[in-house]
Amino acid sequence: KGYQYLPVVLKVIAMTTIKNVSEHQAGICVTMSVKLPAILTRQLAQTSCPSLPDPMNRYGYLAPQYGGLRIRACPSGTIYSENQCRYKSNMNGNGGLRGSARKQFRQCSAEFKINFDDGFKDISKGGLAFDYSHISLRRGKGVFVGNSKLYIWGFQSRFLGKTFAIRMKVKIKRGAGKYRPEPIISNCGPNGDSSVEIVVHRGKVIFKAKTSDNPEAVFITEDYDDDKWTDLTYYYDGNHFGGSCNGRPFRQRTGGNLEIRDNPMTIGLCTGQNGFHGEIDELEIYTACIPKDM
């Protein structure tokens, strides 16, 4: 705290916008200037996009966080597009997908995937930072007991835009959410209400999406069976918010971008709420594509 790291990839920004940082200081910790947030604000306001291209790495981008910039990686098979303010498929000079990227997109790869078979391991190639607490393992399942949570830091301050999807398999314990909502997955937290969320409350699974074109969030409510495995899907494609609960599909028209939250994507627990009681077998999160079977 009180310091801001300026890595080498930010050298162009540091040298041209912060007068008290010299060339030899790029890449070391320097005392943070109060001018930095204003500089970032101007940089981002020029495009109305909540992220900036990484001048040294087309496979990543820069996102504001805690008054500074954080380097984010694009999903495998994609590059960052400043014009589109999001990932796009990695095209070669002839306008076609490279072989590896073509395979990635045909398969629609998840950016984060965990199934608890090998413990707490992200088995995707997304490389997102995450952490967990108070989750136990039972026969390849994650057991959540009310104070358990897994939080994915890679989604903090993340631009989700018009392409986002979740697939998960859960077993909701009888009585879960009887008195207060229990979040299964959400970008809830102290820095704003959630824009993406699946919770259990009073015998229902409730799906939520908050987009930039709508003043009110969209909520969809579905039934489920206690103590039985439930397949959940959630997607937003820029025009519709949809998903399914045990194969029963839902879809509602909406528009705009999923709103950004300066919170990590959290599984199992939100600040000030009851935590989830149940088990999770699989969790997949997609940001570059939506699987065709959703």
Swiss-Prot record:
GO cellular component: extracellular region
Gene3D superfamilies on file: 2.60.120.200
Tissue note: Component of the organic matrix of calcified shell layers like nacre and prisms.
Protein name, entry field: Shell matrix protein
Superkingdom of source: Eukaryota
Taxon lineage: Eukaryota, Metazoa, Spiralia, Lophotrochozoa, Mollusca
Species per Swiss-Prot/TrEMBL record: Mytilus californianus (California mussel)
InterPro entries attached to this UniProt entry: ConA-like_dom_sf
Primary residence: secreted
Compartments, record wording: Secreted
SUPFAM superfamilies: Concanavalin A-like lectins/glucanases
